[in-house]
């Protein structure tokens, strides 16, 4: 698509969202071959695809966050798409991430498009929710001082419990208005659950244990909480500046994957301690 993973203006390669090229492709053979599946979708950078797991296998319901376009929905496994932006107030919305709670409510993150540290400008990010399968959207108030939402996770056992990852505004040494925030009432009220890194890219809930959370950020950090965000421990191990996302290993709850910006994918123990099969970086020893 030509779009950087995190939509920040200084990283764009194009002057307008209309110049981005991309869309959705589908594979029916496990990823060996792919073909475009974009009927009804404008040329766009698709930043996220969400599948409704309750939809029938022969006609999957899919949602796409389209950079500069909004949200597209398909009810036939991606064969055709329709734009679903009723209630989204931004012009050319930078639809960034979608999430689905266990009760079927959808959430949409619209990315911030400005580096401005002020609140209330046209570049503010936003959070929306839909209770009717994306037919209409309602804006959810962000936590006070936040205008850069990045990621959203829901508790699989409590659909009203939301975790929001936010990117700081460019104010102060490390910025402000970032971290992780939690809501126990579907986004009506928020409280800060983590502020040790003001530039948090994403927050993840372990599907095997909803009390376990992971966070990844810019300050060379990955974090873990075992009590629903009350306390956090830094995960040692990944030696890279900009973490992207922490993904629990589906085959081993004691292991995680950590994706990064340009530093590859790391795999190791969730506590960060090296295991007997870890691969160590070789040291250069000239002359030996």
Residue ranges of each PLM-predicted region?
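Extracellular glycan-interacting surfaces
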Residues: 1-288
């Amino acid at each position: 698509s030509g779009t950087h993973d995190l939509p920040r203006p200084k990283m764009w390669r194009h002057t307008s969202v209309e110049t981005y090229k991309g869309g959705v492709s589908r594979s029916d053979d496990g990823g060996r071959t792919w073909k475009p599946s974009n009927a009804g979708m404008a040329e766009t950078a698709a930043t996220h695809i969400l599948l409704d797991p309750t939809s029938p296998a022969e006609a999957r319901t899919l949602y796409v966050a389209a950079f500069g376009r909004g949200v597209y929905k398909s009810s036939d496994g991606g064969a055709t798409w329709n734009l679903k932006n009723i209630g989204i107030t931004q012009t050319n919305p930078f639809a960034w991430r979608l999430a689905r709670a266990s009760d079927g409510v959808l959430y949409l993150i619209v990315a911030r498009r400005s580096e401005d540290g002020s609140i209330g400008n046209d570049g503010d990010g936003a959070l929306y929710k839909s209770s009717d399968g994306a037919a209409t959207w309602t804006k959810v108030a962000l936590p006070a001082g936040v205008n850069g939402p990045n990621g959203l996770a829901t508790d699989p056992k409590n659909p009203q419990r939301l975790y929001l990852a936010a990117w700081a505004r460019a104010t102060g040494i490390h910025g402000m208005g970032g971290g992780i925030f939690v809501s126990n009432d579907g986004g009506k009220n928020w409280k800060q659950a983590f502020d040790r890194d003001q530039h948090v890219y994403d927050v993840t809930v372990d599907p095997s244990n909803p009390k376990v959370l992971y966070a990844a950020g810019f300050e060379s950090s990955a974090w873990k909480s075992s009590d629903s965000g009350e306390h956090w421990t830094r995960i040692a191990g990944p030696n890279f500046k900009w973490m992207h996302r922490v993904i629990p290993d589906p085959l081993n709850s004691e292991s995680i994957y950590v994706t990064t910006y340009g530093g590859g994918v790391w795999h190791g123990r969730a506590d960060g301690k090296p295991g007997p099969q870890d691969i160590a970086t070789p040291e250069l020893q000239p002359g030996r």
